[in-house]
């Protein structure tokens, strides 16, 4: 038994800057009754083609929808996803096909500790896109072990790009990022 530790740079080449995410309704990452809740090779292998297509189109990652109705948001390839909707931090509830990330849990617990409204629930892609249009969705960000906090500047769905937070990092994502990296660096 041994442990290897190694300092690394930012997970994304652009560092802590908003990423571009493509929503996939063509492919799925995990299915009901499967092992989407665990880090297994099969979950990653199933996502390779969609991620390749996203990168060829200039997107950083893929946002996965549920495998049955293909309308409920699940997670991004390398991180869980959060939305700031009407000043409430919302993330998809764990359904067995979403990885219960430790950074996800940290965001939920910190948000509650700070007195922010935090909710886990089912969120449709249409709710998010309509919220981006009418301003009720003010931020989108991911949370993961490697990425820590990653602001989303663009969501693409069915060939249409939707800008988030004017393409800038929002204050909620920034607060979580600064706090979590502050813990890491001391």
What are the residue ranges of the model-derived segments?
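Helix-start/capping segments and mature chain N-termini
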Residues: 2-186
């Amino acid at each position: 038994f041994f442990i290897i530790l190694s300092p690394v740079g930012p997970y994304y080449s652009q560092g802590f800057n908003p990423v571009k995410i493509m929503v996939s309704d063509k492919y799925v990452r995990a299915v009901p009754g499967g092992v989407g809740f665990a880090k297994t090779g099969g979950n990653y292998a199933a996502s390779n083609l969609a991620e390749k297509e996203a990168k060829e189109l200039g997107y950083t990652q893929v946002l996965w929808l549920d495998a049955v109705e293909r309308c409920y948001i699940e997670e991004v390839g390398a991180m869980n996803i959060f939305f700031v909707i009407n000043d409430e931090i919302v993330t998809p509830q764990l359904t067995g096909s979403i990885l219960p990330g430790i950074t996800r849990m940290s965001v939920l617990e910190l948000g509650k500790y700070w007195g922010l409204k935090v909710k886990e629930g089912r969120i449709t892609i249409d709710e998010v896109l309509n919220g981006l249009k009418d301003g009720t969705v003010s931020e989108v960000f991911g949370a993961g072990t490697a990425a820590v906090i990653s602001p989303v500047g663009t969501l693409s769905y069915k060939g249409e790009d939707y800008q988030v937070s004017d393409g800038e990092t929002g204050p909620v994502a920034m607060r979580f990022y600064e706090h979590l990296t502050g813990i890491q660096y001391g």
